[in-house]
Amino acid sequence: MTKEFHHVTVLLHETVDMLDIKPDGIYVDATLGGSGHSAYLLSKLGEEGHLYCFDQDQKAIDNAQVTLKSYIDKGQVTFIKDNFRHLKARLTALGVDEIDGILYDLGVSSPQLDERERGFSYKQDAPLDMRMDRQSLLTAYEVVNTYPFNDLVKIFFKYGEDKFSKQIARKIEQARAIKPIETTTELAELIKAAKPAKELKKKGHPAKQIFQAIRIEVNDELGAADESIQDAMELLALDGRISVITFHSLEDRLTKQLFKEASTVDVPKGLPLIPEDMKPKFELVSRKPILPSHSELTANKRAHSAKLRVAKKIRK
């Protein structure tokens, strides 16, 4: 891992080991990031195995081309610079119509958070950006300065689950009427000013939920995850597995619901046997989400909210 792209991988062994890797299998890392999961997965593949890695951040791919060089030289890795919502189309174009396993590490990566100019962090002053793909058009600046009041309230409440969404949106509306809100610090201060004093005494930064909400809107994170996970589940071969790491309740709720729908069936009352074509296509590998160990939590504070869910395809 290069110094410019330092990222501590969360739930490394659990996420990959739960995929039950076949040495000659075809696998996908839908969120390459710092390439930690990819490197560990590749170490389990034989010469016939292959890994397809997706990331919309060119810096992540540039970093992986260094850290995964030995596997690249053996022709075991293919990098795809794209949003993982296009996963099915991109894989199909490469002649891949079935995979043995796939993993997702959802949310923003540590290097993106730590790189000041990306504008993801409320702790560092930077232009309002928050794009995971630097070539996409919508930025946090546009959301904050051009979205109508009601849209801001909806986004803050839906994606940030902040009970002061209206007050914050009103404060933003008043400020931008005087001049555009241009930096993360300006926005964070407005959010703080919109909240009552007793709220500011609570643990955690007062701007955290709103920054999350804007980031999700800018990158359409939940829409992309929904599309991609459903497509991935279709692509899985029989006995193929999918591992999904989430970092907040919205991502976890989405993943849990998709897995539940695929692993359960509504059987009409009184039906003695479930017809084959009505049986669920998936089963949960673990009923409850897998959480980081105590030692991992001690070593990496960013792992504290991580949850891993895994499902296995049992019927085509």
Curated annotation (Swiss-Prot):
Subcellular location: Cytoplasm
Keywords: Cytoplasm, Methyltransferase, rRNA processing, S-adenosyl-L-methionine, Transferase
The reaction(s) this protein catalyses: cytidine(1402) in 16S rRNA + S-adenosyl-L-methionine = N(4)-methylcytidine(1402) in 16S rRNA + S-adenosyl-L-homocysteine + H(+)
Pfam families reported for this sequence: Methyltransf_5
GO molecular function: rRNA (cytosine-N4-)-methyltransferase activity
BP GO terms, sorted: rRNA base methylation
SUPFAM superfamilies according to UniProt: Putative methyltransferase TM0872, insert domain, S-adenosyl-L-methionine-dependent methyltransferases
Enzyme Commission designation: 2.1.1.199
Uppermost EC category: transferase
InterPro entries associated with the record: RsmH (IPR002903), SAM-dep_MeTrfase_MraW_recog (IPR023397), SAM-dependent_MTases_sf (IPR029063)
Chain sites annotated for binding S-adenosyl-L-methionine: S35, G36, H37, D55, F84, D105, Q112
One annotated Gene Ontology cellular component of this protein: cytoplasm
Family: Belongs to the methyltransferase superfamily. RsmH family.
NCBIfam families with a match to the protein in the record: 16S rRNA (cytosine(1402)-N(4))-methyltransferase RsmH
Biological role: Specifically methylates the N4 position of cytidine in position 1402 (C1402) of 16S rRNA.
Protein name per UniProt: Ribosomal RNA small subunit methyltransferase H
Organism for this UniProt entry: Streptococcus pyogenes serotype M1
